[in-house]
């Protein structure tokens, strides 16, 4: 039997109150379920879960990420980005899922993420959560290099495909559109909510 690929996620992550953190949490949970992991009490049954998350955070938040599969990355420590790349390279991770939003990474326009990408030896699939229709430096330069260093790009807005192709000259074969989606609440939550609203 062949094993399922191991994915390392790079993003903000819960308990941080951030849309990207919530998105990555739900994405990881859905992938674990698709890979056949059972949920118990809302958490994957595998201990520790196989897919690590590099959790972007501030120095004072690192203690929030203490589970064995959580790897805190202090966003303003440039040297830590290379160390994370080396750690992923030495692991059994097969692919990296980078969730990109300019504000979550350190440096000008989030440029520190480039330090990580330049040293990664694993394939990277980057989800661009923001693509500017009229990009300008330094955002253009950072996003162009991220695109060049990524094996594939995902966007959740069809218009972003044309923006990446036109402004950044990314080839069409390298970009895929996926709908953002939303988590499906458990049946008991739906039933309770319906009662609360008198349905």
Question: Where in the sequence are the language-model features?
Answer:
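A short helix/loop element that forms part of the nucleotide-sugar donor recognition site in Leloir-type
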Residues: 186-199
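N-terminal subdomain of nucleotide-sugar transferases
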Residues: 1-71, 91, 150
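A short, histidine- and acid-enriched strand-loop-helix "catalytic/donor-clamping" loop
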Residues: 101-105, 122-138, 152
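Phosphate- and divalent-cation-binding pockets in alpha/beta enzyme and binding domains
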Residues: 163-166
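Hydrophobic residues at beta-strand termini and immediately following loops
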Residues: 178
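Membrane-proximal helix-turn-helix segments that form the acceptor-binding/catalytic region
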Residues: 115-119, 137-153
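Carbohydrate-associated surface elements
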Residues: 159, 181
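Short N-terminal targeting/anchoring amphipathic segment
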Residues: 71-73, 84-110, 125-127
């Amino acid at each position: 039997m062949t094993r399922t690929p191991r994915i390392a996620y790079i993003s903000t992550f819960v308990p941080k109150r951030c849309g990207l953190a919530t998105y990555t949490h739900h994405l990881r949970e859905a992938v674990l379920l698709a890979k056949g992991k059972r949920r118990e009490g809302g958490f994957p049954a595998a201990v520790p879960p196989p897919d690590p998350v590099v959790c972007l955070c501030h120095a004072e938040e690192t203690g929030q990420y203490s589970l064995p599969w959580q790897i805190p990355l202090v966003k303003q420590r440039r040297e830590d980005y290379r160390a994370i790349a080396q750690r992923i390279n030495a692991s059994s991770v097969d692919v990296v899922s980078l969730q990109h939003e300019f504000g979550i990474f350190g440096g000008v326009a989030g440029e520190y993420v480039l330090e990580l990408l330049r040293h990664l030896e694993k394939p990277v699939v980057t989800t661009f959560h923001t693509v500017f229709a009229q990009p300008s430096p330094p955002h253009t330069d950072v996003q162009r290099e991220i695109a060049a260093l990524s094996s594939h790009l995902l966007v959740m807005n069809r218009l972003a495909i044309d923006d990446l192709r036109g402004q950044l000259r990314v080839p069409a074969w390298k970009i895929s559109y996926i709908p953002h989606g939303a988590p499906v609440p458990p049946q008991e939550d739906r039933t309770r909510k319906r009662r609360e609203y008198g349905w």
